A protein has these predicted regions:
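C-terminal helical "lid" of AAA+/P-loop NTPase domains
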Residues: 217-225, 231-245, 264-268, 278-282, ...
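Conserved GTPase G-domain signal focused on the G5
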Residues: 106-108, 228-231
Length: 350
């Protein structure tokens, strides 16, 4: 303090040091799907054929236009991002344009943003002097949601800018991509991940995070709950861990929005209108999803050993009608009552 009053500066001994411990900045928590996203194509789970072809393309430094399709959560986006990192290294951000479902991808965006990026000419070396492919990469995630006009505009850009740009389209349904684009791309189908590989990957992530999953049964439930989607399963496990402090079977049902099996069976076994009215009122008060109930009910009806074929047919027919109405914006209350009445009739007339 004396030194400060005389010179206006703190001396080396006067600097605030708290307890002499260096302050360490804590990293903010990151989503597990990003934190453990594969860094190289060899880290991609259960897509051996795709990885082999990509490895050969990368070894020659040449990449064709690509079309990745398959179920969600199978590694399509991770594969192309890993390939881009291996191709471009430290300049990946400058060489890659990624557009996904959150971006506007109408015809105007294709004509302006994508076309402008594709027309840029790039060098064949990095700032550090290492060789680099002389082209850029445009990644269009969920390309099957693009309009036909936007896809037609993209086709023209793909034709004209092949020398300086490669395109990778990612979609769930290849049938929604126009033929002129599919004919210009090398198509790769990402198959559903094997159950044991998904569980193994979930186990690795949980061990890395220090999360106790007991005998692993909860991981099997996570795979069943998320229908084999590795991304959804990882997100569900992280949500359960962050919200509840531990991963449990009931916690997974809660964070994924599933309807408890007890409620599904209760709805399927209603015998009169009074029971139905009480169930629907409590179901909606608890804020469960009617669409989710109908989806789970469909699987239960088909596999049920207590219902006759006649009962299954009548319930399934009404279930399909009510599901369609919900998709069209119908009221959940009305559809639950309508289907419930059909279930009552079926239960009372086996």
């Amino acid at each position: 303090m004396q030194a400060f009053l005389k010179t206006g500066k703190l001396s080396a001994t006067d600097k605030p040091s708290s307890s002499g411990v260096k302050s360490t900045k804590k990293k903010p928590p990151a989503p597990w799907v990003e934190k453990y996203r594969p860094k190289t194509i060899d880290d991609i789970v259960d897509q051996g054929e795709v990885v082999q072809v990509l490895r050969e393309c990368l070894s020659g430094g040449d990449l064709p236009h690509l079309l990745f399709y398959g179920p969600p959560g199978t590694g399509k986006t991770s594969a192309i991002l890993a390939a881009a990192r291996q191709l471009f290294g430290d300049i990946t951000r400058d060489r890659v344009l990624e557009l996904n479902a959150s971006d506007e991808r109408g015809i105007q965006v294709i004509r302006d943003k994508v076309k402008t990026f594709a027309q840029l000419t790039v060098s064949s070396s990095r700032p550090d002097g290492r060789p680099c492919p002389p082209y850029k990469l445009v990644i269009l995630d969920e390309a099957d949601s693009m309009t036909t006009a936007a896809q037609a505009a993209l086709r023209r850009t793909m034709e004209r800018e092949t020398r300086t740009t490669r395109f990778c389209l990612i979609c769930n349904y290849v049938s929604r991509i126009i033929p002129p684009i599919t004919s210009r791309c090398s198509k790769f189908r990402f198959k559903p991940l094997a159950r044991e590989n998904v569980i193994k990957r979930l186990q690795e992530v949980c061990e890395a995070e220090g999360v106790d999953v007991g005998d692993g049964q909860v991981l099997h439930q996570a795979v069943d709950t998320c229908e084999g989607d590795l991304r959804r399963a990882l997100t569900a496990l992280q949500c359960c861990q962050r919200l509840l402090g531990k991963i449990t079977a009931d916690g997974l049902i809660e964070v994924t929005g599933l309807v408890p099996e007890k409620l599904v069976n209760e709805y399927l076994n209603v015998k009169n209108y009074s029971e139905l009215e009480k169930f629907v009122e409590k179901f909606l008060m608890d804020a469960y999803s009617a669409s989710q109930l109908l989806e789970q009910l469909s699987a239960v009806v088909v596999t049920s050993g207590h219902l006759t074929n006649k009962q299954k047919c009548s319930i399934s027919e009404k279930l399909a009608v009510c599901s369609h109405r919900l998709l069209d914006g119908g009221a959940e209350l009305m559809q639950l009552f309508d289907l419930g009445c059909a279930i009552i009739v079926a239960n009372n007339n086996p």
